């Protein structure tokens, strides 16, 4: 029995070394997985490295995981001494097999705080663990801590160099944000309705992206295709609701500052903000009504193409509520100089609009470049923007017509039930 335990210990020590060696040979490993193998058939290492993929034969897990787990617990109980390299190797192996073991992440936090470990290493480790365990809450929690630590180090280094937030630091933070968006997208694709992944993405936009309008609009654009391919993913659509709500908050703040809606633009090319920063919000303009209408159009296409998905109807409810809130706030914030009073009439439609908003409603969009001879052509996506006036397409009546059309033409009982529920909610909002 004692000899068998010694053999197992020798085996797992070799496996830990093989995992460490694999990372040294190829620092660009981007995925980990288990290789189904009930028992060891050959006298070789169970660690397989093929290009940038790391595989672990399943037969060794029952020996490896308890070994590294107990070893780390003995260290925390001060019954076993492990040097820096041993701690890094043991926690790395353990977290690749069980990333929700909080103690291992806490040990690595201490190593980072002592300057022994670079937070970038933990971001790489977490990214790798998420390829196998994309919903791991402890991995996402530690990732946010490591990101805060990394950004703090970058800012402190810039201040020490008396460069304030130099362009290099800003570019580095922007690169971190882009990498996090990629990690979140990969994790969301590996696990349906990955709430932890989308919540992390929201956190990145809030704390690293500072809710910049540029980032918000870019994220709306970049996630459009994703949600179109995952029409039942509540978390993905909730993320788009967060983006639009954030843009709405910026618009409402602008009402307080200038007494009218931000200058609206009809040219699609100008919807994304300048890449060189945002010194002053009042100098920024974006077309929120246009973005909301685009979201409603996208939702309508998905509802027609994929009947019977409750997620789409819940999302439509949220977006129409944002439109309703925007128009109410805009009417309440209107001033005589720039607008005429605007309140919902008895039918639930907007009886009057600000002159600024009304001009957007009535003026055709310059999608053909008629006013600019330098513009040449336009894509099919821009062609699709030739539509009815915004006032009509965003009204209660238009929504009721849409619902009636769905109820008349659909053959899905689920679709009929969701449409009827949406109509009931719409009428309650109209009566409010």
Swiss-Prot record:
Organism superkingdom: Eukaryota
Entry's Gene Ontology cellular component terms: cytoplasm
InterPro entries named in the record: Prenyl_trans_a
PFTA repeats: 86-119, 121-154, 179-212, 218-251, 294-327, 395-432
Keywords: Prenyltransferase, Repeat, Transferase
Keyword Transferase: yes
GO molecular function, a single term: protein prenyltransferase activity
Family the UniProt entry places it in: Belongs to the protein prenyltransferase subunit alpha family.
The protein, known as: Protein prenyltransferase alpha subunit repeat-containing protein 1-A
Organism listed in the record: Xenopus laevis (African clawed frog)
């Amino acid at each position: 029995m004692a000899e068998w335990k010694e053999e197992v210990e020798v085996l797992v020590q070799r496996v830990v070394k093989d995992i460490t060696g694999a990372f040294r040979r190829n620092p660009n490993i981007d995925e980990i997985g288990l290789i189904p193998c009930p028992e060891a058939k050959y006298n070789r290492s169970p660690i397989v490295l093929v290009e940038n993929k790391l595989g672990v034969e399943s037969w060794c897990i029952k020996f490896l995981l308890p070994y590294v787990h107990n070893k780390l617990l003995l260290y925390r109980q001060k019954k076993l001494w492990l040097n820096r390299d041993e701690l890094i190797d043991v926690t790395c192996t353990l977290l690749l097999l069980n990333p929700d073991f909080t103690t291992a992440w806490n040990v690595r936090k201490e190593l980072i705080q002592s300057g022994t470990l670079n937070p970038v290493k933990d971001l790489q480790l977490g990214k790798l663990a998420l390829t196998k365990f994309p919903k791991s809450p402890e991995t996402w929690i530690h990732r946010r801590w490591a990101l805060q630590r990394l950004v703090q180090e970058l800012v402190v280094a810039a201040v020490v160099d008396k460069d304030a937030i130099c362009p290099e630091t800003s570019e580095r933070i922007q690169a971190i944000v882009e990498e996090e968006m990629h990690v979140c997208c990969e994790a969301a694709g590996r696990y349906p309705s990955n709430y932890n992944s989308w919540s992390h993405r929201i956190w990145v936009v809030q704390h690293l992206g500072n809710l910049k309008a540029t980032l918000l609009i870019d994220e709306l654009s970049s996630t459009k295709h994703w949600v179109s391919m995952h029409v039942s993913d509540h978390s993905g659509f909730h993320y788009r609701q967060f983006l639009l709500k954030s843009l709405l908050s910026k618009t409402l703040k602008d009402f307080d500052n200038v007494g009218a809606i931000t200058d609206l633009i009809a040219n699609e090319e100008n919807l994304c903000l300048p890449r060189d920063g945002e010194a002053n919000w009042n100098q920024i303009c974006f077309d929120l009504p246009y973005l909301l209408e685009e979201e409603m159009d996208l939702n309508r296409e998905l509802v027609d193409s994929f009947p019977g998905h409750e997620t789409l109807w819940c999302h439509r409810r949220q977006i129409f509520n944002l439109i309703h809130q925007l128009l109410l706030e805009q009417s309440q914030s209107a001033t005589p100089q720039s607008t005429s009073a605007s309140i919902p009439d008895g039918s639930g439609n907007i009886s009057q609009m600000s002159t600024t908003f009304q001009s957007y409603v009535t003026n055709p969009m310059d999608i053909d470049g008629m006013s600019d001879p330098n513009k040449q052509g336009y894509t099919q996506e821009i062609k699709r923007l030739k539509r009815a006036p915004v006032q009509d397409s965003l009204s209660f009546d238009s929504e009721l017509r849409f619902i009636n059309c769905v109820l008349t033409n659909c053959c899905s009982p689920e679709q009929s039930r969701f449409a009827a529920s949406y109509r009931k909610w719409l009428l309650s909002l109209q009566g409010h």
